[in-house]
Curated annotation (Swiss-Prot):
Keywords: Disulfide bond, Hormone, Secreted. Disulfide bonds join 52-163, 180-188. The keyword Secreted applies. It is found in: Secreted. The lineage of its organism: Eukaryota, Metazoa, Chordata, Craniata, Vertebrata. InterPro entries: 4_helix_cytokine-like_core, Somatotropin, Somatotropin/Prolactin, Somatotropin_CS. This is Somatotropin-1. Belongs to the somatotropin/prolactin family. It comes from Acipenser gueldenstaedtii (Russian sturgeon). GO terms for biological process: animal organ development; growth hormone receptor signaling pathway; positive regulation of growth; positive regulation of receptor signaling pathway via JAK-STAT; response to nutrient levels. CDD domains: somatotropin_like. Gene3D superfamilies: 1.20.1250.10.
Length: 190
């Protein structure tokens, strides 16, 4: 196999993370428009279902905090976040039919697996083959609930989609911070 330059690995990982974050935001908005009346949107943001597992790991919450962490730590956090979504996203297409969510859900899973492979490749290239991330976030998110006629199921899915969007934003931020730190570019904005 030809060696892929580190800059290309970072570029590919950032592009995948940006794509996943945008897709997560689109799916969240589509779900909100389709299933959540306005008055329920605000109350659900404060419900326990809006709690994200990723909030239990000591991951940076923004770019300023991310800049204080090593690349290896940021890759470990990114990998842990991605792996926590692999199982739940396998069931996403069975939950939502006849919508943007259904049309994109299989792509989300494929892109997530691609990003996981990219991060593993970055860790390998940076000499972090130990994959210590498994200790960071052993929890994985629940599967999406198929019964959309039930309010509890709607709130659960809404909360999961909100967490997925937040987590993909974190991964995107971490990868951009690392790329900007390693490869000085004139258009490097966070």
């Amino acid at each position: 196999y030809p060696m892929i330059p580190l800059s290309s690995l970072f570029t590919n990982a950032v592009l995948r993370a940006q794509y996943l974050h945008q897709l997560a935001a689109d799916i969240y908005k589509d779900f909100e428009r389709t299933y959540m009346p306005n008055e329920q949107r605000h109350s659900s943001k404060n419900s326990p279902s809006a709690f994200c597992y990723s909030e239990t790991i000591p991951a940076p919450t923004g770019k300023d905090e991310a800049q204080q962490r090593s690349d290896v730590e940021l890759l470990q956090f990114s990998l842990a976040l991605i792996q926590s979504w692999i199982s739940p996203l396998q069931s996403l297409s069975r939950v939502f039919t006849n919508s943007l969510v259904f049309l994109t859900s299989d792509r989300v899973f494929e892109k997530l697996k691609d990003l996981e492979e990219g991060i593993v490749a970055l860790m390998r290239d940076l000499g972090e083959g130990g994959f210590g991330s498994s200790t960071l976030l052993k929890l994985t998110y629940d599967k999406f609930d198929v019964n959309l006629r039930n309010d509890d199921a709607l709130f659960k899915n809404y909360g999961l989609l909100s967490c997925f969007k937040k987590d993909m934003h974190k991964v995107e931020t971490y990868l951009k911070v690392m790329k900007c730190r390693r490869f000085v570019e004139s258009n490097c904005t966070l």
